[in-house]
Amino acid sequence: WVRDNTQGIGTLTFVDQNGKYGALGHGISDVDTGELLHIDDGALYQAQIVGNQKGSSGSPGELSGLIHYEAEKIIGSIEKNCEQGIYGKLTDMSGLSGLKKMEIAYKQELEIGPASVLCCVDGEIREFEAEITRIDMNHEDTNKSFVIQVTDPELLDMTGGIVQGMSG
């Protein structure tokens, strides 16, 4: 059989000045086999976060959202799916207006200490306090080379920490 579509709510990791983006921080896998999906092309849609399930010990929690599948809600293309995430080009960057530009760092530039995470848990992209607590450049899974812990009381109250849908 052939899987002809997939869907989910996720986080943009970065967008450069030309609209090229990376998202999720992990690849999209087949729900039945666990295998990484081969994606020839796809569309990135605007989504609306409508709530979240707070995470707790043994329960990861998750963001809940609506994906608007109308043609006018397409905000970009998906050109690549790999173990590190999905990559493509945004065609509509209006949702990013008002956000401050930030420099990205190579993983070898990471340092243990204060950090921040940008995420949308209540309909608005906001910055929250966090801390990088461990760095492991030799981890067998390159997606798990550092540990970040949410320290922001407001985000902890809302979500309990990092929940599904925030990866990226």
Listing of model-derived features with the role each one plays in the protein:
Residues 1-168:
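C-terminal recognition in membrane/secretory proteostasis and scaffolding
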